[in-house]
Amino acid sequence: MPISLEHVSFTYMKGTPFEKTALHDVNLQIEKGEFVAVIGHTGSGKSTLVQHLSGLLHPQKGSVCVDGVNLNAKNAAAKKARNSVGMVFQYPEHQIFAETVYEDIAFGPRNKGLTPEETDRAVKDAMAFAGLDFETFAQRSPFRLSGGQMRRVAIAGVVAMEPDYLILDEPSAGLDPRARDGIFKEIMALYCKRGIAVILVTHNM
């Protein structure tokens, strides 16, 4: 089953002099296993779109469904559907909060109800995938890492949740060419290995 948007519209500060329409009558379907790029200039509504896909924003008109479940619903099925979508924000400091890298990555698996042993395994697997050596980084503060390393922590935190859909909002923003290439290699490796859907937001090709 896909993520589907049907006739979705969203306007910021509606009814004020600063009203700005970000989405107007958008229809979109993303199947599991697809790699989709959302490309547009700054301010074109890309981030607004993917925040609807992840359930962070709700449409003012239309509907967003994940695997046939409306994300606007307030029930266990909608919560499970939202948990199947992982999102890495443009700037990792927006979603990194714990005192150590380990605790930050472990937050999601614990929230899903995994046992301590399962959580530990999920953290180690996610760190290995993201290119973060466990012994070197597990007990370090994520806020003392480089931009590229912080981005890897953010990606590892989402990967540890094992989402069916992974949204990456400008994952290479602010990174040097080497770090950018490394991030994209990891994204492609995850896509090829797990067969999840990847939605990549960018302002350039």
Give the residues covered by each predicted segment.
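The feature captures the beta-strand-to-loop junction immediately N-terminal to the Walker
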Residues: 39-41
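Helix-to-loop junction immediately C-terminal to a conserved catalytic motif
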Residues: 54
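ABC ATPase NBD Q-loop/coupling interface
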Residues: 63-80
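Conserved ABC ATPase signature
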Residues: 141-145, 149
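Hydrophobic anchor residue at the start of the ABC signature
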Residues: 155-156
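Conserved catalytic motifs of ABC-family nucleotide-binding domains
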Residues: 162
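Catalytic Walker B motif of ABC-type/P-loop ATPase nucleotide-binding domains
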Residues: 166-169
